[in-house]
């Protein structure tokens, strides 16, 4: 797709304003244009696209880097040691734009343009050592870590290093590194001449919903400032993607968000299938949609129950876990697993639906609407719940976009942005469903939107049940992994492909591709770079929760600690999704 066809006004305006500094358009298979810019206009171009152009790009969806030192297939791209990529979204245009910058290890900061670029730039510094010309702290790795893990020169396995020995000296150094001085962070310790209480909220606290620490400055029960500290759950998922085959990385996707099941597999496979040119059969697409909506309900039931629990209602979570069990029994019967199914495949799904699947699904669909009605009476209509949530933790659409908020957190402000409707994938254009919206953007609306989304997911699942097409569940394509078993038993070429893919790995054509979906928490995006091998050269995992937590310091000042707990619950995150 050419840039002129995708966003002609933006292209013309950008070239008119910056001329030759807009260096080149990169030929890719992406659904959006990819432009290279000069460093001299990197910040100015982002400011122009966000603040000055008609129909602007208010959302910085992602900012990430690529170590180009070992890459062989870069025809037509400027020389670069580390390439910096920003991914911008225009809601008015319903269009994306990716900007690239060739660097020698130094890059201008755009944190003054897009507020949420701060954490992304800290991550790029942490993982690649990029210097943004400002003080940049590590964010995922501990401050004592040596090296930058996503550089190609950094080891990927513990066996590549000498055995680890925890000496007394090292233990003391690591212990000192856990101490955070508010003064060094520029955070006040006095208010009106009185000393603030500095409190570590987490990392081991039930209300942080994971291994997550927030450093708080308190005046009595009032939160004066908050400083989130993440990284405790970091496992190096993007580094692992470089050491696994394209097929072998699928189980790792489940663990990016361990409550999302197959939802985290889908954007990765959409990206790989785009690179391979694979068209997924209609039956496989509908199975994917049905399972994604099941896992959306499973996640939202957990959120619903724990949200009520965190404001003092203990009963709902027990009832909702019982209903989640009914859903997990169906998912277990179809995929063979409850939470980590690894069921999707390159080109389709692992196997066809089992006998009796339709009766199980129909029983769930008949059961759940009345249960959701009961939960609405227990939670959303409760005067106590409304008193704790209405008007608390509110933000508007502009603020949400400024900090990269997507999903229910964005739609709670009244912004109608759902990729299943606006950019249908995997056959979502076939389904009739509504996009629930809020008005105030407060805790109550965020809860209400997710409660209503479960009803819409039930509608989608029922349409899958009633309209499931016949046909294969894997594409008839040489790069489908693994190939359909029936073809392997008849066709020697398919058997050879299976042998090569299983023993060596799928050889994916060189190029770049992105898979985007409307995940249960928001925009989930995988950007993959292939160098024509059996493994990914670079896999970028954009999760919604990483952006959502960055917003906490702007929302919670002035709240009580009890309201802080409610606000954290309303974000709906898991730390594996944040830290990867």
UniProtKB/Swiss-Prot annotation:
Its main location: membrane. The keyword NADP does not apply. GO terms for molecular function: NAD binding; NADH dehydrogenase (ubiquinone) activity; NADH:ubiquinone reductase (non-electrogenic) activity; quinone binding. This is NADH-quinone oxidoreductase subunit C/D. It comes from Cereibacter sphaeroides (strain KD131 / KCTC 12085) (Rhodobacter sphaeroides). NDH-1 shuttles electrons from NADH, via FMN and iron-sulfur (Fe-S) centers, to quinones in the respiratory chain. The immediate electron acceptor for the enzyme in this species is believed to be ubiquinone. Couples the redox reaction to proton translocation (for every two electrons transferred, four hydrogen ions are translocated across the cytoplasmic membrane), and thus conserves the redox energy in a proton gradient. It comes from the Bacteria. NDH-1 is composed of 13 different subunits. Subunits NuoB, CD, E, F, and G constitute the peripheral sector of the complex. GO terms for cellular component: NADH dehydrogenase complex; plasma membrane. The gene is nuoC. It is an enzyme of class 7 (translocase). Keywords: Cell inner membrane, Cell membrane, Membrane, Multifunctional enzyme, NAD, Quinone, Translocase, Transport, Ubiquinone.
